Amino acid sequence: MPRRREVPKRDVLPDPKFGSVELTKFMNALMVDGKKSVDERIVYGALEQTAKKVQGKEAIEVFNEAIDNAKPIVEVKSRRVGGANYQVPVEVRPSRRLALAMRWVRDAARKRGEKSMDLRLADELIDAAEGRGGAMKKREEVHRMAEANKAFSHFRF
């Protein structure tokens, strides 16, 4: 247990356009070198593209659906027992779930081949909302690892 005092969580303000705290957190995760204005332009541009491509749904709905679909339920953690390292499956805390989903969507969007980042992000959000794409692939991979190491789940933390 840490001996220092617990650091308080900082509240994140909702974004001005959609009023979503999750969207602000995603913007902060996407930000490079503290350039928030560039980041906002990318995210809002991506959401506009998403609204054009997906008919009958709001862009923020697609974003929320994409993040929810990408959230992992279980992951593996290394645990050393008697000189051997075991990959022990553990349930993911809700705050970490959100952070991992956002990170995976961001990384998958960066790896895509489209011309600009807002197009990449828009397509990745649409793919994740529909249950495919790089972020979903990463989630399935993590779940497969946990399933494969289910035998070591009695080595709980």
From Swiss-Prot:
Organism, scientific name: Eikenella corrodens
Pfam family, one: Ribosomal_S7
Name assigned to this protein: Small ribosomal subunit protein uS7
Gene3D superfamilies listed in its UniProt record: Ribosomal protein S7 domain (1.10.455.10)
Domain of life of the native organism: Bacteria
Underlying gene: rpsG
Assembly and binders: Part of the 30S ribosomal subunit. Contacts proteins S9 and S11.
Function: One of the primary rRNA binding proteins, it binds directly to 16S rRNA where it nucleates assembly of the head domain of the 30S subunit. Is located at the subunit interface close to the decoding center, probably blocks exit of the E-site tRNA.
InterPro entries: Ribosomal_uS7, Ribosomal_uS7_bac/org-type, Ribosomal_uS7_CS, Ribosomal_uS7_dom, Ribosomal_uS7_dom_sf
GO biological process: translation
Record-linked HAMAP family: Ribosomal_uS7_B (MF_00480_B)
Gene Ontology annotations for the cellular component aspect, listed alphabetically: small ribosomal subunit
Gene Ontology terms for molecular function: rRNA binding; structural constituent of ribosome; tRNA binding
The entry's keywords: Ribonucleoprotein, Ribosomal protein, RNA-binding, rRNA-binding, tRNA-binding
Family the UniProt entry places it in: Belongs to the universal ribosomal protein uS7 family.
